[in-house]
């Protein structure tokens, strides 16, 4: 029996009533649970001898907005952009019938030498998840980062402040609907002789997937494509 097979067996035996999904792919085991079951599941994973997950090595947020789209919706841009070269697809590559946001935890057992990914989806209208900082101290800054970048609140966190963005920053920059150029820029005003904040004056450009067209512009004299 491999380590992953052993882990899956113990998860099914001890946490079947608390998890909604269990998968094993690419050598990694992943479980999903509801928000209200997070703390009971995490306590079992840390304290039960069969698991012994003594380290939280990563925690992050995920935004699944537009996940599975074949291509992006384009808007007017220089020379009409590249939308004319994209064949629109009616269906998505992947269908996700779950809330937009998720929180992902990666656990490591130094005693058992196995790893586990724990995922839970959070309703956009109620982005609140219990903090696990009292179980693993490393969660402190991980949770602050997820709050800063995605706006996910961690109930019970002792110091839930922004971690990476500037003072007074508005919005959460890793959300898929956050503008690439941002909302506010900081610059030096020579007239006022001080640093000021102002709305960005960058004109958004449309970033689109590369489109390869098989027409005469890309065919060499001998009928072969140029490198």
UniProtKB/Swiss-Prot annotation:
Subcellular location, record wording: Cell inner membrane
EC number(s) from the headed UniProt entry: 7.1.1.-
GO molecular function annotations of the record: NADH dehydrogenase (ubiquinone) activity; NADH:ubiquinone reductase (non-electrogenic) activity; quinone binding
Assembly and interaction partners: NDH-1 is composed of 14 different subunits. Subunits NuoB, C, D, E, F, and G constitute the peripheral sector of the complex.
Record flagged with keyword Translocase: yes
Family membership noted in the UniProt record: Belongs to the complex I 30 kDa subunit family.
Organism: Legionella pneumophila (strain Paris)
Protein name: NADH-quinone oxidoreductase subunit C
Main subcellular location: membrane
Recorded catalytic activity of this chain's protein: a quinone + NADH + 5 H(+)(in) = a quinol + NAD(+) + 4 H(+)(out)
Summary of the function given for this chain in its UniProt record: NDH-1 shuttles electrons from NADH, via FMN and iron-sulfur (Fe-S) centers, to quinones in the respiratory chain. The immediate electron acceptor for the enzyme in this species is believed to be ubiquinone. Couples the redox reaction to proton translocation (for every two electrons transferred, four hydrogen ions are translocated across the cytoplasmic membrane), and thus conserves the redox energy in a proton gradient.
Membrane topology value: Peripheral membrane protein
GO terms under cellular component: plasma membrane
Swiss-Prot/TrEMBL keywords: Cell inner membrane, Cell membrane, Membrane, NAD, Quinone, Translocase, Transport, Ubiquinone
Record-linked Pfam families: Complex1_30kDa (PF00329)
